[in-house]
A protein has these predicted regions:
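Hydrophobic alpha-helical transmembrane bundles of multi-pass membrane proteins
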Residues: 1-217
């Protein structure tokens, strides 16, 4: 998905900002891997909710920081799950890149990337896809009439998190210099290529989730 976002954003900005967009997308993937390894995977899917004395905070996991997979489960499936979590952390972070294109310094964007992939996105994953109180997979008490929430493909977990962060960032930064004077258009061919790549990257997850739901109904 990083490739899709990169092409979509490159096609949407002025040509002089192409290199900046590409560097930020590559940086997203790299910093997401580091932060997901250091703290993200533990906050998202750590062993239990033991940040409080009752053991029930329902918002973040803990334990096993600086890890790729659980020490009790090093199967290929667990490793694939870690890889999947890392790619979605990077994807959620990259959503903001397009929203503030041509308006943010690289240092400011780097700081945001560290915070979102390490400390904002992982608790959302825990609440929606882990053992958090929003999750339908939780064995204990759940919100929404004890039904919880099922997010098959990340529309809430990934895209809503990135979208809210993008709205906040765009609102804080404001319009670009020179607005409303139009800048030279980007390249529509890259926009189309990016959209097609994102479609292909996204289509497998909903199909697999739907198949699982049907098999357990």
């Amino acid at each position: 998905m990083q490739a899709g976002f990169a092409m979509l954003e490159v096609g949407s900005v002025n040509k002089k900002n192409t290199k900046n967009i590409l560097v930020k997308n590559i940086f997203d993937a790299c910093i997401a891997a580091i932060m997901w390894y250091a703290v993200g995977s533990s906050l998202a899917g750590g062993n239990g909710d033991d940040f409080t004395s009752t053991g029930e905070n329902g918002f973040a996991g803990s334990g096993g920081f600086f890890r790729t997979v659980s020490t009790a489960n090093k199967s290929a499936y667990a490793k694939a799950g870690w890889f999947f979590g890392w790619t979605f952390a990077g994807a959620g972070c990259t959503i903001v890149s397009g929203a503030i294109a041509e308006r943010a310094t690289f240092l400011a964007y780097a700081l945001y990337s560290v915070i979102l992939t390490g400390f904002v996105y992982p608790p959302v994953v825990h609440m929606m896809w882990g053992a958090g109180k929003f999750s339908a997979w939780r064995s204990g008490p759940r919100l929404f009439g004890d039904c919880g929430v099922i997010d098959f493909a990340g529309s809430g977990t990934v895209h809503m998190t990135g979208g809210v962060a993008a709205i906040i960032a765009a609102g804080c930064i404001g319009v670009r210099k020179g607005f409303p004077d139009a800048l030279p258009e980007g390249q529509p061919v890259y926009q189309a290529l990016g959209i097609l790549i994102l479609w292909m990257a996204r289509r497998r997850r909903p199909a697999k989730a739907f198949t699982w739901a049907c098999s357990t109904a």
